[in-house]
């Protein structure tokens, strides 16, 4: 599973993707380690769905209590926005903007995803049999509502819970630059950035 910060291109041949990777290669180390100095938090996980998939979606943090263990502090020369504990002025949307701007210096971005989003796809529907009737759809929606109520009560803003309801982007590892047929776990990693 993954959260896409930036899709550079889609529906291209292997040769076209190879050319994009070659053009971007000098910028990839900076792109993948951007989260080391530009830290943002995602909070309030919820299950969401549309006609093709179900996902866990997050919101950019905006002042909620930091629940994660302390991260490696930044040295003064590395500090861009500090740690998540210093505030949420720098959000995931700022990170997406900065990744876009840095990548755009090397290649033209031709992404399918134009709306800012922070979601991890959990699964895609193979068919609509499970949603074929109003009763099936009502049962599906009720199950998602029940999970979301549990998340809000047991995970959001719970400092000592079994699960932590936030994600500091880049904690443990930086961004993962990948190429190839990436849907459903395909493709390969070019480089993974430094975590904290």
What are these regions (language model features)?
Residues 1-196:
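Histidine-dependent nucleotide/RNA phosphoesterase domain, centered on the 2H-phosphoesterase fold
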């Amino acid at each position: 599973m993954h959260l896409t910060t930036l899709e550079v291109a889609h529906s291209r041949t292997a040769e076209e993707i190879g050319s994009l990777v070659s053009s971007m290669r000098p910028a990839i180390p900076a792109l993948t380690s951007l989260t080391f100095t530009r830290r943002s938090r995602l909070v309030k996980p919820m299950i969401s769905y549309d006609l093709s998939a179900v996902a866990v979606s997050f919101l950019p943090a905006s002042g909620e209590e930091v629940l994660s263990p302390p991260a490696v502090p930044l040295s003064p020369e590395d500090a861009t926005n500090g740690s998540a504990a210093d505030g949420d002025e720098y959000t995931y949307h700022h990170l997406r903007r900065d990744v876009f701007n840095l990548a755009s210096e090397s290649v033209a971005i031709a992404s399918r995803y134009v709306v800012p989003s922070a979601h991890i796809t959990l699964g895609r529907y193979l068919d609509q049999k499970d949603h074929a009737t109003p009763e099936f759809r009502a049962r599906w929606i009720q199950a998602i509502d029940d999970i979301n109520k549990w998340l809000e009560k047991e995970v959001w803003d719970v400092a000592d819970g079994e699960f932590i309801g936030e994600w500091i982007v880049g904690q443990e590892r930086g961004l993962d630059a990948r190429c190839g047929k990436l849907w459903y776990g395909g493709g390969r990693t070019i480089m993974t950035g430094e975590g904290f």
